């Protein structure tokens, strides 16, 4: 008797073998379309000659300029890259740029290592710097010195080493009087405990003399885990490193001074490396100086550089005496960066470095995340320092700039639209996302809606749900007008109300999910296949807190089914005007997905081992043993490629017999199912039938392919069975 094998779509790992009878149990690199399983598309490198990205990318964002040219932001924990659709360019922002004292480069005979002397350099091992203007030094040529380097070791606060490609012929110093060094923002870690980043100190993590994320006068380091938020401001780009503060202890005894009857405040900061007319944030002046209150001494200040060791700013009040103070004061460059698309080869700069046309008032110097409001064209900073310049970062505060100036955050100016709100439910903001008519904001315990309401309030806030969590800042996505996210033990959706999503692979995912690495979860969509995809780290690798993304789970929101597989993608972006979704792997390369049917990370491309396996399928309700002696497969190899005419794209069709749920699975029979194809005639000829002989109460089916160029879809196969008794 011929029996149709029509299985329920989706993978179910949470039911028992018999409870899921007639369903699918396991898979890799497959999806469901119209209820039937098929192999997914492959992936190819976007640029065949790409050099691997430096660092680990955990964010992708695309936009276009006014001419329609498309750009893709690709920040890592070490660099900030942009793909301009023809090449990948490095726009990493600088934290410091200055000309050093004369002859700052020291060599040691026969060594390729050089020592750079720079007082208060703030460098850390792994940071990138660029040297220019140096002359030959003791056998190491200028061409070997004037380039980009990685700091290899830090000798002290005034010296560090880098390694050149040259070899010194003697010991000594040199380099000339115009040696310039540009310091890129500090390298972040690739791992950190979930939400244990910058913010663990008494006021958001102490900021210290070594720059972003170090404690003044201490040896501890707070984490910057390399996460970025990115958005476009018109055709330009804005971005912010998560919880990262570019702060420097001003240093010295009483470095902030006033002069009687003057409103000019002088800051003495040795080798500050700051430029004229930029805005810096002064923080930590704890008492008035010369009669000027701390609310005027602290805050965003546009500075005038007096010399390499001093700069000035003005206050509203004049001093009533000549005085000095501020021994604990810190100068901070705001961490929100801006990239002007009309200068594509220039680095991204801090908001405080924008030109005189910008007001630069009350800039936030640190934030958990930023975005640009679609409705109001305002930069919104989540979990930032408040408007009150005497207070530290508050991870429940939301601020937004004036709609006409990304640098004006002055909420006291009633002619502007800047504003501030502190949320009430939760301890810290985790992330936010733009929906059609509202912004969704997750704290550690709740979900808020943030809706434009117009002046004088700007936005209205409502709690729409509590008592759940979110795995990490990138574990959410909006598809249509529905938000989906991954928590630490469930999947959720919000379509006006919060719902825990029914999930047939919940135990499979969450019993293996490395919760301590939740900040690495990356959620995106593939609109062409109606899929929400979560890439997540499993517990099967390394210690907790250092595990990398190695698995994925998919929810098909049209078919309402789940499936999963093994693949490392640290960031992913939907098609959005492109033919393919794009992704970054932990190997540092960019890939087009749904491109061909093979693994393009190798050269030549290699096969994708795609398979799907069913749970037990009872024969004749399982009350008798039955013989299975024939299989009529129903498989199409449509769009298979790369095979020469005389080859046969094939899959392996395996039948696994079993007597009882707990009994041993029989050896089974594996038979190749092939299609003969003619490239000239486009003739498809399927294998008609397969003959086998096995006896069981139930069978499981497995379909697998491991050849290049193979595409397949399974239909409704049939088994020819014959009843054979009860034992």
Predicted regions and their residues:
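Short beta-strand segments and strand-loop junctions that repeat across beta-rich extracellular domains
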Residues: 79-83, 193-198, 334-341, 386-413, ...
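Elongated alpha-helical scaffolds
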Residues: 75, 222-250
